[in-house]
Amino acid sequence: MEMREAYIERQTKETRIRVKLNLDGAGTAQVDTGIGFFDHMLEALARFGYLDLEVAAEGDLQVDPHHTIEDCGLVFGQAIREALGERRGIERVGDTLLPMDEALVQVALDLSNRPYLVWDVECPEGMVGGFPVEMAEEFFRAVSVQAGITLHIRLFSGKNRHHILEAIFKGFGRALGLALRENPRFQGVLSTKGVL
């Protein structure tokens, strides 16, 4: 199979985001978004998905972290889409149940080229290390739309914001890694239509 890599850069009046992605990596990450907790989450996502990920983001953090977080999701999603190519010879779907202390999260996804997010997460409002809790949903919506992923995220239990968010990011990485696995038993796309 060909190299599944991408480099995407996006610049607006609010942000400048650069993402380099290797879907067949070892889980290494170099992330600098200016939001320490968000960096930690993206590093965890990469580690649990065995992705090599580089993210460099400059944003209007003096205003709010919203633009930086959402735009990172947009560019990361675009990088996934580009690196996937025609989505041939992969498992396509991935599902994981991931615990972190009292938090238990399920993430199920389909690299279907049909973007859709179901966010069934009741997380205590507030901030974690400069990261507004509600921005996790916006990040994953942006990833889903840009990458063409049907994505379901469900929280079964949890009280600690940090634990809940970390379980979500790790769970997404794990489910994505499973969906990206190559399957030598077929060469085309896993679809009765023959295309995604």
UniProtKB/Swiss-Prot annotation:
Keywords: Amino-acid biosynthesis, Cytoplasm, Histidine biosynthesis, Lyase. GO terms for molecular function: imidazoleglycerol-phosphate dehydratase activity. Pathway: Amino-acid biosynthesis; L-histidine biosynthesis; L-histidine from 5-phospho-alpha-D-ribose 1-diphosphate: step 6/9. It comes from the Bacteria. The keyword Lyase applies. It catalyses: D-erythro-1-(imidazol-4-yl)glycerol 3-phosphate = 3-(imidazol-4-yl)-2-oxopropyl phosphate + H2O. Its EC number is 4.2.1.19. GO terms for biological process: L-histidine biosynthetic process. PANTHER family: IMIDAZOLEGLYCEROL-PHOSPHATE DEHYDRATASE, IMIDAZOLEGLYCEROL-PHOSPHATE DEHYDRATASE HIS7. This is Imidazoleglycerol-phosphate dehydratase. It comes from Desulfitobacterium hafniense (strain Y51). The gene is hisB.
